Amino acid sequence: GIKRMKVSNIQKGLLVRTMICAVSLAAACFFEASLNVQAAPRAQETGERVTVVIDPGHGGDNEGTLEGITKEKEMTMVTALAMYEELTKYDNVDVYLTHTDDVSMSLADRAQFAAERNADFLFSIHYNASVDHDLFGSEVWISSVQPYNAYGYQFGWEQMQQMKGMGLFLRGVKTKLKDNGDDYYGIIRESTARGIPSAIIEHCHVDEGRDIPYCQTEEDWKRFGREDALSVAKYFGLSDADTGVDYSAEADALPEVSLQSILPATIRDKTEPDICLLSLLNADYDTGEVTLEVTGTDYDCPMMYYD
């Protein structure tokens, strides 16, 4: 795609520096929630009743990121409790929280908690931040191991749909590996080792201007929990006889997946964009305004350029 931008207040002596800085524009591959999805059924088989474990991220001495309006552990607890309250309204679902008090709990213990309850899925609730405070958007981390990769991708796609509805930028459904090829994130690794599908939900970045409006108040954190519950309800096709809500059709309208190998869409694309061109269209030294044109193409994934 092509993006034109104007850089104001540029003096003659700074034009070259401005051009150099512009060349460093970053490219980010992102998950397109409106992708053409073949209506495939949920790959994960379950019994008549579904068991869900919600894990409020961090706790105790592990406070999570401190870059937001409050400690991450406080935000995740509010979100998890709201998610729990919403999910328990549906029929044929048992919902558990790994903890409800502000306590330290190892990742292995969280996964073991889910295993002891024969959980169909463990959802770890989190908020994000970045070193340079310049990243934004929502993402879901899942296992690289099949069939958990496929299960996680189908759920993550549903979660991204909900985040898109809120107006958040979608960073995607992804895997991250250690140097030895194992899953990087402990809660995912420990859950997979116990045969429990899992996903880390990183709702937004608490330290970046685009995302901050989404996570300022306790009501904001509760809203995320309700959206999470809706994602889970749609993924499992839950229903509520009292209200007439029935999401069984949604569980048959998920992305098509393979249980044989890791889904390419969940693998981080580390290659450079195929085309990345920067052109100077105009430089008005009287007004101090420079107009640049950026052309970018990446055949491996959708791409957005930003400065």
At which residue positions do the language-model features occur?
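Gram-positive cell-envelope targeting signals
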Residues: 1-45, 304
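Short, solvent-exposed loop/turn elements at domain surfaces
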Residues: 61-65, 209-210
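Glycine- and acidic-residue-enriched helix-capping/strand-helix junction motifs
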Residues: 64-78
